[in-house]
Swiss-Prot record:
It comes from the Bacteria. Belongs to the CbrA family. InterPro entries: FAD-bd, FAD/NAD-bd_sf, Geranylgeranyl_reductase. PANTHER family: CONDITIONED MEDIUM FACTOR RECEPTOR 1 (PTHR42685:SF22), GERANYLGERANYL DIPHOSPHATE REDUCTASE (PTHR42685). Pfam families: FAD_binding_3. This is Protein CbrA. One of its GO terms (molecular function) is FAD binding.
């Protein structure tokens, strides 16, 4: 039975970043359900926008994005739509439009060969025994059993590691649904859509490489029905759909209290969305995935006597920032306050009257 210093479950942005940073410094094994290349197998449904905080992480690490990861077009504003109030506002944002699956595979490709990576693998069982973490996983057609001093859960919203460590922990979840359509709009755009009759979270649209992606986060019970209802409503705001080319869905976490951020225990650690590190106001998680990976790297290399306590302290600033996103989310999803903010025109950039796309309903009071 092979033994490692660190076993990482999941190679999204958080797991890939940590594996790369620990390579050559610790003996690391990493398991991931995505294939090593190509479009077959698992791919994460995601709008694919790289926020400024994530961009700063790449600057810090001296990395530049390859052209095959970057999507077309690059748009510098977000149309914010309040459906009930028939209001549309235009806010400047500095996102980078990316192909999320290509981005994830590129992040994995940066992991040095000294890390033992198993692609297209499935973690079957984890447990702690004799001060070691035991992991049974299936890869290359057969089951393997390894042990590790440290276990890292970088396995996202449905984290197996989080469920094992905190079996009674409850965090609000939504089903994220999105569909891809052939782009019909004369000018591509991003949008953020609020409709409290549909969801107390939000919906979105993104133009990407000739496609129009429309999605949102909805209650788990009847998410598909709510998604369909919102699509019908958006025709009043000049959204054009047609026949769906592809449909995707996944679970997304929605932290709503301080206790929703969990970092691990007993030499097991959680990073990225597995720890609840996702923005409640935008559902953006890549920047927090990269930041938490960097924090855990520093903890591992310092080898403190109480690693879990050190990681908890080191993530305090990150957790405070994310708690601020919870407060912001409550403001954005409060109909009266949101309507007041949008009516005030603060930070709104008006577009020319003859601009070819004005996403307002016929009853708009702009």
């Amino acid at each position: 039975m092979e033994h490692f210093d660190v076993a990482i479950i999941g190679l999204g942005p958080a797991g890939s970043a940590l594996a790369r940073k620990l390579a050559g410094k610790m003996q690391v094994i990493a398991l991931d359900k995505k294939h090593q290349c190509g479009t077959e197998g698992f791919s994460k449904p995601c709008g694919g926008l790289l926020a400024p905080d994530a961009q700063r992480s790449f600057i810090r690490d001296g990395l530049t994005l390859p052209v095959d990861v970057i999507a077309n077009p690059q748009i510098f504003s977000v149309k914010t739509v309040d459906v009930a109030a028939s209001l549309t506002r235009n806010y400047q944002r500095s996102y980078i439009n990316i192909n999320r699956h290509a981005f994830d595979l590129w992040m994995k490709s940066l992991i040095p060969a000294s890390v033992e990576v198993y692609h297209d693998s499935l973690c079957r069982k984890i447990w702690r025994e004799d001060d070691k973490w035991h992991v049974i996983f299936r890869a290359d057609g057969w089951e393997q059993h390894i042990t590790a001093r440290y276990l890292v859960g970088a396995d996202g919203a449905n984290s197996m590691v989080r469920r094992h460590l905190y079996p009674d922990h409850q965090i609000r979840k939504y089903v994220a649904i999105q569909q891809w359509f052939a782009e019909k709009h004369p000018v591509p755009f991003y949008s953020c859509i609020f409709d409290n009759a549909i969801t107390d979270c939000y919906s979105w649209s993104i133009s990407k490489d000739g496609y129009f992606i429309f999605g949102g986060a909805y209650p788990m019970k009847d998410g598909q029905t709510r998604f369909t209802t919102l699509k019908e409503k958006m025709s009043a705001f000049q959204f054009q759909f047609g026949k769906a080319v592809k449909s995707e869905k996944c679970t997304v976490l929605f932290p709503s209290r301080w206790q929703d951020f969990v970092c691990g225990k007993d030499n097991a650690f959680l990073i990225g969305e597995a720890a609840g590190f996702i923005s409640a106001s935008s559902l953006e998680g890549i920047s927090y995935a990269l930041d938490s990976a960097e924090i855990l790297r520093a903890v591992f290399l310092k080898q403190p006597e109480k690693s879990n306590a050190a990681y908890w302290r080191a993530t305090h600033k990150l957790r405070l920032k994310l708690f601020g996103k919870i407060v912001k989310s409550r403001c954005l999803t409060a109909p009266a306050l949101r309507k007041w903010i949008m009516r005030s025109g603060v930070a709104h950039i008006p577009q020319l009257k003859d601009y070819p796309t004005r996403f307002t309903s016929p009853t708009s009071r702009m």
